[in-house]
UniProtKB/Swiss-Prot annotation:
This is Oxaloacetate decarboxylase. Its cofactor is Mg(2+). The keyword Lipoprotein does not apply. The keyword Iron-sulfur does not apply. Substrate binds at residues 50, 159, 235. HAMAP family: OadC.
């Protein structure tokens, strides 16, 4: 089966946004996972920033991965993907000018869409890891992203954290981002349908949710009715791969089965703990 062109996959993603339906993403962290996801019928995949950091660096989601490293992984996937790939481009790897560079590089990598978030990254001294930048700065970064895009079919999605804001603040932000001309709004931290409905009535473009398999947000028809077109429910496939690797190697060494689950294994074998210590010691960052 021939691999579709980047332009075709971007058009496919646009069709998903315009379909009136809600789709779940596959966690596509390397070329094989992307091809498996397409063969199993997934309509869209996502390369998560946290997953890329673990896969490339064995590092936690502390904005340690560089644009070049992330783009290299996206390029490997984009070279053979048979479904549209969303790239979690974090904060665009810096200020508005860095965002422009991010757009250029990820567009060349072949992604169908990418998200740019308003989190203050990398975390600053004395700040929380979930702090957000001022809305004016975020608007400037989104305008820069749209300016840098060459293929107008590639979708640019603005992301914010509704769990760190009041409902009124969230509405104010998404309205400001929508006015810039982005192709969608991505939100993390939506608690339930009441929370979603209060915000979604102010959004006239497609919505993407990072829901982490929230049991309060599992009614796909109701999600679609509220404008939600894409839902990210975590990266179970990636963590299952970690667990499978551990179990295979453990059995080859004749070691008895342990009690660690996939999440605990990723913590044990990543550099999470030392980075937490360093962040608290040198930057006074609070999670």
């Amino acid at each position: 089966m021939a691999t579709p062109s980047q332009h075709d996959l971007r058009n496919d993603f646009r069709a998903l946004l315009a379909s009136g339906k809600c789709y779940y993403t596959a966690s596509t962290f390397d070329p094989m996972s992307a091809r498996i996801a397409a063969d199993l019928g997934f309509e869209v995949g996502i390369l998560g920033g946290s997953v890329a950091s673990l896969q490339v660096l064995a590092a936690p989601d502390f904005a340690l991965i560089t644009l070049s490293e992330f783009t290299e992984q996206a390029t490997r996937i984009g070279r053979v993907a048979r479904l549209p790939i969303i790239a979690d481009a974090d904060h665009g790897y810096g200020n508005a000018l860095n965002v422009m560079r991010t757009i250029v590089e990820l567009e060349r990598a072949g992604v169908a869409a990418l998200t740019i978030e308003d989190t203050l990254l990398p975390a600053k001294y004395g700040h929380k890891s979930t702090d957000l930048i001022p809305v004016e700065e975020a608007v400037g970064k989104l305008k820069a992203a749209l300016e840098a895009r060459i293929d107008p079919i590639m979708s640019i999605i603005a992301r914010t954290n509704a769990g760190q804001l009041s409902t009124e603040e969230t509405i104010s932000r998404v309205k400001a981002y929508q006015a810039v001309g982005v192709d969608g709004i991505c939100m993390v931290g939506i608690r339930d349908f009441a929370h979603l409905e209060e915000i979604s009535q102010h959004i006239s473009i497609p919505i993407m949710l990072v829901a982490y398999d929230n049991p309060e947000l599992r009614d796909r028809e109701r999600l679609a009715a509220n404008g939600v077109r894409i839902v990210v429910n975590g990266h179970a496939a990636y963590f299952a791969a970690i667990k499978a690797t551990y179990d295979c190697l453990r059995e080859q060494r004749g070691i008895a089965e342990g009690t660690l689950d996939a999440s605990e294994l990723s913590t044990r074998y990543s550099t999470l703990e030392e980075n937490r210590v360093w962040a608290n010691k040198y930057m006074d960052v609070q999670e």
